[in-house]
Structure formats: C-alpha cells, structure tokens
C-alpha cells in the first residue's frame, strides 16, 4: 500500500505498508521524529516510521504480553527483542531537513563500527557490509520529503531503497547480507541509545495495545490509524 504524500506541515505514515519486493504488508508499530535541541529550540531532522510483520504480535506476546506501554518503553530488552525478533521489520525515514547520503551513512555506520569494535564483534564481514552501505548512499542527496526505506529480514539481510516522496516502490533496492548491520540500523533508531525517543514511545504504546488484544486463537491482522508527524 502506498503511503500518503508528504506536505509542508506534516509527514504521514499510513497504518500499513508493503516493503519493496515483500510478499505482504506490515502494520505500523510506531512513529516519531529524530531531532536535537539547539539554542533552546528542538530542531527536527527526520520523521521515522517502524513497521512490523503480523508475526511480531504472537512472537512478542510470549514474553511481553500483559505489560503496559510504560513498562515496555522503559525496558531496553523489549526493544532488543523487536530488533532481533524472528519477523520482518520495515523502517521508513523521511527527511524534514535536507541531508546528503554520505552524511547519513557516515553517522549511522560510525556508531555501529565503534560499538562492534568495543565489543570485539568487528570482522572483515562487517567491514565489507559497511563499505557497501556507504556506497549505496554516496550518490544520494535527500531533499525534504525524500525517504530512505530499510527492510530488515529475520535472516539478516538489510535491503536499502529510496523514494522521492513518502511513497514506497513495489520493488527495487540493494540487499546487504550482514546480520549485525541489519540489526544495528534498527537498533540505532529504537535501541537503548536510539535516535528517536518519540518513535520508541509510540512503538511501546502500539505494541502494548496489540499484545493486550492477542489471544491464543490468533486475532485478525492488526490495524492502526495513520500517524501524522508535525514538521
């Protein structure tokens, strides 16, 4: 399903979205902005929507069923389980302010590499994946309204695609086979040091609501209202 178009006052994330080349649609788990406080003003850089495969609900219910939104939001292990869960995730990052592809890729990968090296996890495979990631972004320039699309497969394949607006193409993208990078990109958004606390709160609230409705008989596919992020 195509996303509604971005306009000057808001970025809209529809209740469902189909990742490029995916067999099915995913539901909107949460959305929020990434920004920073500068001179007493909160400057918004991007709006981020995180979509989850329907299988996420029963998978997360085993451990997190019955938890409130506040309990989920305050527990880093919950977000880690979303990142590493055996279900597909789809992330749409829409620009509010302009940014070059090189700037975006450098910021994402420098944090990943620093963490991996500190944890003794950095290998030649990660080095190759990081270079491929940077090469994908190198020729890109993101004007306000352009989107970066990440599909995170449970097998550890990160697919990167781009859109000139907030729509999602039916196919296309570059696949990077590296589980650590696949998880790290989403971890950088909703992890313990994630860049979008607003998206984390939104995700915790929505998943808590869905888990409360989850039954052993399996509920219908989850639905959500569109989320509008003021730019």
UniProtKB/Swiss-Prot annotation:
Catalytic reaction equation(s): a chalcone = a flavanone
Q: This protein is called what? A: Chalcone--flavanone isomerase
Q: Name one GO molecular function term.
A: chalcone isomerase activity
Pathway given for this chain reads: Secondary metabolite biosynthesis; flavonoid biosynthesis
Q: Which InterPro entries match?
A: CFI (IPR044164), Chalcone_isomerase (IPR016087), Chalcone_isomerase_3-sand (IPR016088), Chalcone_isomerase_bundle_sf (IPR016089), Chalcone_isomerase_sf (IPR036298)
Top-level taxon of the source organism: Eukaryota
Tell me what gene encodes this: CHI
Entry comment describing in which tissues the protein is expressed: Pericarp.
Q: Give the source lineage, highest ranks first.
A: Eukaryota, Viridiplantae, Streptophyta, Embryophyta, Tracheophyta
């Amino acid at each position: 399903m195509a996303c509604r178009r971005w306009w000057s006052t808001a970025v809209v994330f529809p209740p469902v979205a189909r990742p490029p080349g995916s067999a099915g649609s995913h539901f909107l788990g949460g959305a929020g902005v990434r920004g920073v406080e500068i001179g007493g003003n909160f400057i918004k850089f991007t709006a981020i929507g995180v979509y989850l495969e329907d299988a996420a609900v029963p998978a997360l219910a085993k451990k997190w069923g019955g938890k409130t939104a506040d309990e989920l939001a305050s527990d880093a292990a919950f977000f880690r389980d979303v990142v590493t869960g055996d279900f597909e995730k789809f992330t749409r990052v829409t620009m509010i302010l302009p940014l070059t592809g090189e700037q975006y890729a450098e910021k994402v990968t420098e944090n990943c590499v620093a963490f991996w090296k500190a944890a003794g996890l950095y290998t030649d495979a990660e080095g190759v994946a990081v270079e491929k990631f940077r090469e994908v972004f190198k020729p890109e320039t993101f004007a306000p309204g352009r989107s970066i699309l990440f599909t995170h497969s449970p097998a550890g394949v990160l697919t990167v695609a781009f859109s000139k607006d907030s729509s999602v193409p039916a196919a296309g993208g570059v696949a990077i086979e590296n589980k650590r990078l696949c998880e790290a990109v989403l971890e950088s958004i909703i992890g313990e040091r994630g860049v979008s606390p607003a998206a984390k709160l939104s995700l915790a609230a929505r998943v808590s609501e869905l888990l409360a409705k989850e039954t052993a008989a399996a509920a219908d596919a989850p639905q959500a209202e569109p989320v509008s992020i003021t730019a």
